[in-house]
Amino acid sequence: PIKSSATSDVYKRQQGRGTQRNSNEISVLSWRKFKRIVNKAIKNDDMFTNRADSSRHECRLADAIKHISNNDVYVIDVAKLTEDKQAFVFGDAVRTIYNLKLGEYDGESGINPPSRIIVFIDELNKYASKDTPKYSPILQEILDVTERGRSLGVVLFGAEQFRSNIHQRVTGNCSTHAYGRTNSIETSTKDYSSLPSTYKNMLTRLEQGDYLIQNPIFRSLLKIRFPKPIYKQFKK
């Protein structure tokens, strides 16, 4: 019915007799564009097949994540995927974690979720920057984790090179900030306006492994240093 109505409106407009279309209607061209985008993302792709070959160590992402327990670490590599596929994978993972914390899988055997689940995202400025489109699926999922995840025991841990490029709703909901060495151009942005000039100068001179921690429980920034490995490392 939507398609027929939209087609009729297009025809009337072409004939010069059409009336102004309701803003809630979706044109035929929009439907076709949506279909092309979906088909391009999932058609003839092994990631969307209806079977998982256990002999090749394949598994359903949701089936693996919902069996997470204490001290488990799951690594999902999306670097080689396109942006559309990255959105599918990230959305599926976060939605499974939410359903797990909401008790959607309590009736299944072997389900024993930990009290807290930490979602670590490397290069956060790639997925949740200020330049990311407003309706980006990955950005919406990240914002959902930062704004609602804390009440469910889901914590976002992000790592990025430039804090000033991160979306304001992400940094605004972070309780703890860890600052590593950076340049004076970065510290001159308004994201660092709350830091005293003394700490800004320290950020430009920090050594490798040194960080400044900012948390409401500390009256001032706390400097920490990661210990060196207890074993000798050889560089090629």
Task: Kindly give the residue locations of the regions a language model identified.
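Structured core elements
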Residues: 49, 75-77, 120, 158, ...
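Conserved P-loop NTPase motor cores
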Residues: 81-202
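Glycine-centered loop/turn motifs
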Residues: 70-71, 207-210
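Conserved P-loop NTPase motor module
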Residues: 210-236
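Ordered hydrophobic segments in well-structured contexts
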Residues: 11, 28, 35, 75, ...
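A broadly conserved detector of short glycine/acidic/proline-rich loop/turn motifs that flank catalytic sites
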Residues: 80, 125, 183-184, 216-219, ...
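Conserved P-loop NTPase mechanochemical-coupling segment
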Residues: 16-95
